[in-house]
Structures are given as structure tokens and as C-alpha cells.
């Protein structure tokens, strides 16, 4: 499932290429025809990410709310004046390349339109110079501005929103006996963290994922927030989750050793050499170093 940094990249992408544009909205697959009809011909005013949810705000008090879930992804394309990451979502190819398509030759030629839909395209957005296709989302609906506020009110603070208050997270996580590893995956506690960030942040803080939230010191909870903010900002910039330092990678490329513990079961810890462990926690695999995260 794309984590919060990917959705923030999406919001930035939509704001860059579609904000202020009148859009033709359709549902080639047919499952979103009624919603598409409500948005068709509207102007995209802004795009906002909160955790793993994307809110595309149109005029007329209409908002397209999208949650990509495990399999959702957006694809972009257009003429030479349009720039979009080729795919954002699942599978993770975030920001690897820009692949404009169309008749543009670099001088802003007339846009010939998007290609024929490929696969089950739930939503297609088309502007004068480009297009975006959505496939496989968990949630895709048209709501009002008030309903957007209500949806966001159910979410915890987002580490990538400048207005988010980390003390809200600290209070929430420390007030519960639930294991911190479970709480970090609860979007009502902190919005945007997924399995990778959970594993990596807890490793960096030296915290065992099974420790109850009430047993955390305030500085530990604050450290979780601070590391999450830092790593997710890096994720937005890099287009992928890289948590290791160059020293921990022993000079290897980022892509060859991107994480400390995530999906490294049985491999030696990059700090102490102890084999990394994994176990199921609330139906998801969690990874940790039993030596570095003993407490």
C-alpha cells in the first residue's frame, strides 16, 4: 500500500498540472459513472493529502476523495507542456521518470488527447494538455467540503502537514495500553504511516514494537514523531522510502540497501549484526532487531 509520502507527491502533482484547469471527467470502467458526471466540466481548485487519503477539490463544493489501498495507482501523461510522474501508487515506481505522451514536440503543440483506456480505469481526468487515470482504488467517491472536513477529523495528525501538532500524537500514543507497533498503523493515531515507516522508525528509536504505548517516555514518543516527519519528507523528495545512512549501507547504492529492518528477516542488523526478526502483528508482518530494540 502506498504510504503517506506517495499521496503527498500525488497532491503536489495534481496541483502542479491540473489546478485551475477545467477537466473532462469520465469513468471508462463504468463503476464511477455517476460520480464522474458530477465532476465533469468542473475546475480543479486544489489538491490536498491527509495521510493516505487524497482530496481533489473542485468548484461547486465537490471533492473527489480517493484512497488507493493496496492496489490503486494513478497514471499520468500528456503533451510537451505537461509533466507528470509516469505512475504514482502501486506498484511503487514513484517519481522514477516522466513519460509525456502525445503530439507535443517541445513547442507546446496541440494536444491530441489521451490514449484509449488500458485496463479497468475507474476515473479519467483530461485537461487541455494532459490526462490522469485511476485504477484499483479502495475508495473513490464525490463528497462535499463539509464531508471532507468530517473525514479528515477522523484521522490523526499528518507528519507532512506543517499545521500538524506532534503533541497530539504524543498524547494519543502514550494514553493507550495498545502496543506501539499497532498504534502506528492506526490512521486515527497518526495519518500516513504504513508498514515500512513503522518498522524503520521504531528501529531508529530503539523501541520494541510490542511495547505498550503507556510505557513510552515522552521523549521517546516525541522522537517517533520527529523521525517520521524527517523520513517522510525524505520520501517526498526521493520518491521512495530510504531510511539508511550511507555509512549503514557501506557505500552501496541507496536502492540496494534502503532499509534497516523492513523485509530483512534473518539478515544481520546493520548496526549490531543480530539477525532481524519478524512476526505477525494485527494481521501484518512487523520487523525488528531483538538486540537494538530489546526494550
What annotation goes with each model-predicted range?
Residues 1-295:
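Structured catalytic/nucleic-acid-binding cores of DNA maintenance enzymes
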Amino acid at each position: 500500500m502506498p504510504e503517506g509520502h506517495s499521496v503527498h507527491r500525488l497532491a503536489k502533482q495534481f496541483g502542479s498540472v491540473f489546478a485551475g484547469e477545467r477537466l473532462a471527467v469520465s469513468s471508462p470502467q463504468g463503476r464511477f459513472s455517476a460520480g464522474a458526471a458530477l465532476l465533469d466540466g468542473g475546475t480543479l481548485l486544489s489538491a490536498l493529502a491527509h495521510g493516505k487519503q487524497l482530496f481533489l477539490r473542485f468548484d461547486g463544493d465537490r471533492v473527489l476523495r480517493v484512497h488507493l489501498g493496496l492496489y490503486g495507482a494513478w497514471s499520468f501523461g500528456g503533451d510537451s507542456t505537461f509533466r507528470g510522474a509516469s505512475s504514482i501508487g502501486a506498484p511503487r515506481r514513484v517519481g522514477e521518470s516522466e513519460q509525456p505522451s502525445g503530439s507535443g514536440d517541445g513547442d507546446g503543440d496541440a494536444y491530441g488527447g489521451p490514449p484509449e483506456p488500458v485496463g479497468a480505469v475507474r476515473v479519467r481526468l483530461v485537461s487541455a494538455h494532459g490526462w490522469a487515470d485511476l485504477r484499483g482504488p479502495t475508495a473513490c467517491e464525490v463528497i462535499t467540503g463539509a464531508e471532507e472536513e468530517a473525514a479528515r477529523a477522523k484521522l490523526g495528525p499528518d507528519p507532512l502537514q506543517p499545521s500538524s501538532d506532534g503533541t497530539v500524537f504524543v498524547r494519543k500514543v502514550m494514553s493507550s495500553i495498545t502496543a506501539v507497533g499497532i498504534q502506528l498503523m492506526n490512521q486515527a493515531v497518526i495519518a500516513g504511516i504504513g508498514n515500512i515507516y513503522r518498522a524503520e522508525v521504531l528501529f531508529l528509536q530503539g523501541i520494541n514494537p510490542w511495547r505498550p504505548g503507556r510505557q513510552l517516555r515522552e521523549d521517546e514518543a516525541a522522537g517517533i514523531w520527529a523521525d517520521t516527519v524527517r523520513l517522510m519528507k525524505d520520501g517526498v523528495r526521493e520518491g521512495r522510502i530510504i531510511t539508511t545512512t550511507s555509512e549503514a549501507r557501506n557505500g552501496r547504492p541507496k536502492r540496494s540497501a534502503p532499509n534497516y529492518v523492513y523485509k530483512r528477516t534473518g539478515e544481520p542488523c546493520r548496526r549490531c549484526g543480530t539477525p532481524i526478526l519478524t512476526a505477525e502483528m494485527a494481521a501484518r508482518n512487523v520487523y525488528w532487531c531483538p538486540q537494538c530494540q530489546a526494550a
